[in-house]
């Protein structure tokens, strides 16, 4: 009996000792490891403990150092699998060797398949591929310095199918699909993004402190954990109290304005196309819609466009959907039997903490019926448009909500520390950086920020040639955020544009880096939506960049100006490729110094040259001209394209006389 007890204790001790070996969260069954490069495998153990790796019928041994850290670089391998990896008593299965891509930035890289599904419904419904694996890094911040690992995640090398991809990056989904179709090898897509974050949050302290000491000091301020905790609790409490007061005083709640029998005849009549409510609190809208017997029995979805800000939407007194912030499209499925023959009432309760409540124009507002009701490309065949006329009444007027989240994710270095630093040295094939919207208010330092970001990430991976694809900002008109003007008029006159200035920073930085490329998407945006849906096309352009950067394929990207000269009062721009001929829009010229007043000019493309005709009365004393193209937030009429249809980036260049 004693011998048996001793044996059990001994085995338990062995198990405890072996269990102390651990690997980062990136290492999971189903993972994709990078082909053609040494494969770092690392982790922690007891100091001095032996670590044994078995992989591909070979064994590799090392010993944990005095801090308990260990690392083994497995030899480079060709694409293939599945394989098994054993590290002491830990076992990982279903491992593929292929290409691994890191996608990072803010919300546009994170827009989910669920959001874009109506744009690509048939493709998403029918496509799945176990050779494409998805990994989503969980959001986390760190103010005290770099972390060694990321948080556990539920999307941990899941095979690509509709269910797994539903909450995953649409750009990541389509990039994985596109690259697999090109290479026929396994694809690992790591998405590491956080909506609304500035680039400074993704850069290391070491990269910022020399040139931007105030950014580092700002980050250090938030290292006071007691302050951060107290402020966070105060913000939560203030928000709860604001919400409670609103709920207790909202006439729409107290008088049940969701009830179809509610008399709204005395309410104000508004047209959603030219209405906004500049108040905080709640405002209610109602409209009646007559449904015939045939439609009353069909599966139905309500498309309520996009709204600012929070809405709770009811049909015939029953809540059918709610959205807690401004960006997501409102797509509410109506429960069977709720939509009835005859008169039906849609009621929308807006809750607004600040700003102006309004409908986003140019979005679909309708009832969709039948089996294709979830598609928006093409639109469903059977629809009933909503009347833009609504009855409106204020439920409660409140002061602006006093809560203000600290938002540590917006503080310099916090995301580099928490979710970027721990990923290295996991072997990658390339990086996608899709960010910039949050820096358009101060675009001047962005080029330097971007250079520092690429530099410190390459330093972290010890790979100075790590390929970066910079996705340029899409076209967008932020004026709709205020609710006015309606309709939004095209931007045609020369203007100072923070969006164009940031695009220029992206362009010049990528051009100056031999291991970077620019994916131009200034034709894939939406005037009224900062999160455009055409993510498959974005992924295709990213893929073209990687075709050139990684695989050394001879592919043409967006046209670029390679030289310029002045001839007989005209400016001749020579491009790196042929473009579509014809009259070209959105070119502007100014004196390169002095007051720099820009003037629209006529332009004509022929072959690989664009000729700008200067105005007859334009004779600046400057020794050079400044030439701009597509220098708008939303350059809708910009039309310089390659023969394959790729748009030219906006730019500003100097042309000497």
Locate the predicted segments by residue:
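C-terminal beta-sandwich/jelly-roll accessory domains of carbohydrate-active enzymes
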Residues: 59, 576-657
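Non-catalytic, glycine-rich low-complexity segments
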Residues: 19-47, 93-103, 110, 121, ...
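An acidic-aromatic loop/edge-strand motif
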Residues: 90-159, 190-274, 343-426
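Aromatic-lined ligand-binding clefts that engage carbohydrates, nucleic acids, or primary amines
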Residues: 42, 267, 289-317, 346-348
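Surface beta-strand/loop "capping" patches
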Residues: 34-37, 277-280, 301, 533, ...
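Ser/Thr-rich low-complexity repeats and stalk/linker segments
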Residues: 20, 26-99, 356
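Short, aromatic- and glycine-rich surface loops/edge beta-strands on solvent-exposed regions
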Residues: 80-89, 347-348, 623-631
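Beta-strand-rich ligand-recognition modules
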Residues: 57-80, 306, 313-364
């Amino acid at each position: 009996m004693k011998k048996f007890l001793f044996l059990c204790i001994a085995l338990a001790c062995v198990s405890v000792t072996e269990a102390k070996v651990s690997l980062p969260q990136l290492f999971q069954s189903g993972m994709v490891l990078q082909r053609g490069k040494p494969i770092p495998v690392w982790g922690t153990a007891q100091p001095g403990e032996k670590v044994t790796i078995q992989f591909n019928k070979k064994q590799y041994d090392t010993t944990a150092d005095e801090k308990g850290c260990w690392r083994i670089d497995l030899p480079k391998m060709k694409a293939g699998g599945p394989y098994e990896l054993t590290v002491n008593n830990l076992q990982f299965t279903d491992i593929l060797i292929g290409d691994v891509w890191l996608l990072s930035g803010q919300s546009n890289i994170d827009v989910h398949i669920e959001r874009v599904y109506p744009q690509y419904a048939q493709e998403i419904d029918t496509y799945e591929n176990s050779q494409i694996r998805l990994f989503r890094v969980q959001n986390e911040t760190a103010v005290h310095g770099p972390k060694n690992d990321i948080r556990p995640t539920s999307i941990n090398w899941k095979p690509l199918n509709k269910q797994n991809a539903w909450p995953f990056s649409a750009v990541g989904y389509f990039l994985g699909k596109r690259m697999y179709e090109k290479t026929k090898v396994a694809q690992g897509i790591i998405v590491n993004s956080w909506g609304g974050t500035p680039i400074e949050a993704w850069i290391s302290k070491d990269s910022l402190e020399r040139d931007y000491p105030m950014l580092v000091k700002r980050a250090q301020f938030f290292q006071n954990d007691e302050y951060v905790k107290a402020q966070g609790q105060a913000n939560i409490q203030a928000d709860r109290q604001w919400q409670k007061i609103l709920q207790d005083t909202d006439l729409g709640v107290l008088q049940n304005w969701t009830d179809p029998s509610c008399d709204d005849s005395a309410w104000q009549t508004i047209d959603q196309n030219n209405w906004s409510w500049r108040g905080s609190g709640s405002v209610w809208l109602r409209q009646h819609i007559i449904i015939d017997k045939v439609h009353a029995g069909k599966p139905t979805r309500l498309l309520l466009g996009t709204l600012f800000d929070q809405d709770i939407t009811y049909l015939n007194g029953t809540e059918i959907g709610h959205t807690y912030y401004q960006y997501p499209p409102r797509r509410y499925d109506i429960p069977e039997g709720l939509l009835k023959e005859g008169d039906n009432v849609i009621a929308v309760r807006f809750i607004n903490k600040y700003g102006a409540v309004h409908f986003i124009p140019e979005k679909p507002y309708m009832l969709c019926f039948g089996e294709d009701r979830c598609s928006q490309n093409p639109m469903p065949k059977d629809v009933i448009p909503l009347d833009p006329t609504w009855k409106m009444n204020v439920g409660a007027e409140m002061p602006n909500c006093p809560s203000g989240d600290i938002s540590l994710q917006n503080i310099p270095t916090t995301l580099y520390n928490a979710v970027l630093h721990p990923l290295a040295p996991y072997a990658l094939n390339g990086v996608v950086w899709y960010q910039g919207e949050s820096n358009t208010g101060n675009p001047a330092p962005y080029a330097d920020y971007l250079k520092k970001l690429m530099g410190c990430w390459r330093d972290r991976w010890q790979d100075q040639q790590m390929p970066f694809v910079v996705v340029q900002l899409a076209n967008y008109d932020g004026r709709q955020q205020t609710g006015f003007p309606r309709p939004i008029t095209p931007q045609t006159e020369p203007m100072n544009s923070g969006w164009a200035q940031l695009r220029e920073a992206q362009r010049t930085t990528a051009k100056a880096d031999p291991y970077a490329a620019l994916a131009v998407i200034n034709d894939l945006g939406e005037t009224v939506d900062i999160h455009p849906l055409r993510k498959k096309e974005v992924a295709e352009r990213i893929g073209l960049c990687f075709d050139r950067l990684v695989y050394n394929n001879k592919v043409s990207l967006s046209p670029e100006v390679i030289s310029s000269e002045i001839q007989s009062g005209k400016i001749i721009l020579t491009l790196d490729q042929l473009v579509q001929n014809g009259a070209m829009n959105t070119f502007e010229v100014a004196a390169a110094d002095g007051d720099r007043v820009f003037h629209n000019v006529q332009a004509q493309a022929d072959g690989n040259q664009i000729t700008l005709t200067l105005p007859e009365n334009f004779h600046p004393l400057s020794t050079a001209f400044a030439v701009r193209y597509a220098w708008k937030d939303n350059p809708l009429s910009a039309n310089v394209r390659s023969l394959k249809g790729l748009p030219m980036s906006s730019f500003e260049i100097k042309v000497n006389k």
